[in-house]
Amino acid sequence: MTTTNRLRIALQKKGRLSKDCNELLKQCGVKINWNEQRLIAYAENMPIEILRVRDDDIPGLVFEGVVDLGIIGENVLEEEELGRLARGEKIEYKKLRTLDFGGCRLSLAIDRDRTYNGVQDFVNSRIATSYPNLLKRYMNEKGVAFKSTLLNGSVEVAPSAGLADAICDLVSSGATLEANGLKEVEVIYQSKACLIQRAEPLSTEKQALVDRLLTRIQGVQQAAESKYIMLHAPKDKLKEITALLPGVENPTILPLANDSARVAMHVVSQENLFWETMEQLKEMGASSVLVLPIEKMLA
């Protein structure tokens, strides 16, 4: 277990999650002097220590209590869990929250010219993957017998190199598959980044710091999903407009100078289809509609 007085957090050193994790900490007000060559970094304004490691090492570091927190892709976390369960090893941790970045899917892909009729097409196929445990679980659920070929990188080249008949790999946009003459045919797992904590209780000071970080992370994510909306609204349409703009709390209503028929409305809304919403607001008689981004938010 970790004995340092600093809150120790494991992050991916390189790769798709690294920049997002760094940006999240920055948005949460954690000031860190990053040095690409150093594997340990320290916060300037909080008792926080960052360990920069390989992504597949993070679950084990949290399970064993070497670090207090870790940010990891759910796909890597569950792959490690399944492997440890198969070996009869103990798994203990707390999942604190799913984060709003690192989205991807684990998918089966085949040659783009091959006809696909369903998952039964993979019976007795050789499938190259870096996620053998997630693949095995999915295929067992579907009742499909197959042969797994473990590759830790460049999985997409396996079919053209004659190493496999198909692959099971992470997909974001699908551009890498297309570049290697493959097409996605089955999504077996959806993943995002998540924040996990070691199971053993933290000191009072460390837990208080974790709670502060969680509050800030929630504020950052809510701000990213929300907009601050200001508009002028007819008084007789307030009920309809309020229903159209679901807010975090009730809207603020202010009088307008020299206008007894309308009011100013301010609301923090999580409305997504906003061009359509603005058109509906205009139809209801709203005017001077302003939609502003929110940098930070504590609801």
From Swiss-Prot:
It catalyses: 1-(5-phospho-beta-D-ribosyl)-ATP + diphosphate = 5-phospho-alpha-D-ribose 1-diphosphate + ATP. Keywords: Amino-acid biosynthesis, ATP-binding, Cytoplasm, Glycosyltransferase, Histidine biosynthesis, Magnesium, Metal-binding, Nucleotide-binding, Transferase. Catalyzes the condensation of ATP and 5-phosphoribose 1-diphosphate to form N'-(5'-phosphoribosyl)-ATP (PR-ATP). Has a crucial role in the pathway because the rate of histidine biosynthesis seems to be controlled primarily by regulation of HisG enzymatic activity. SUPFAM superfamilies: GlnB-like, Periplasmic binding protein-like II. This is ATP phosphoribosyltransferase. The gene is hisG. It is found in: Cytoplasm. NCBIfam families: hisG, HisG_C-term. It is an enzyme of class 2 (transferase). Pfam families: HisG, HisG_C. It comes from Actinobacillus pleuropneumoniae serotype 5b (strain L20). The lineage of its organism: Bacteria, Pseudomonadati, Pseudomonadota, Gammaproteobacteria, Pasteurellales. Pathway: Amino-acid biosynthesis; L-histidine biosynthesis; L-histidine from 5-phospho-alpha-D-ribose 1-diphosphate: step 1/9. The keyword ATP-binding applies.
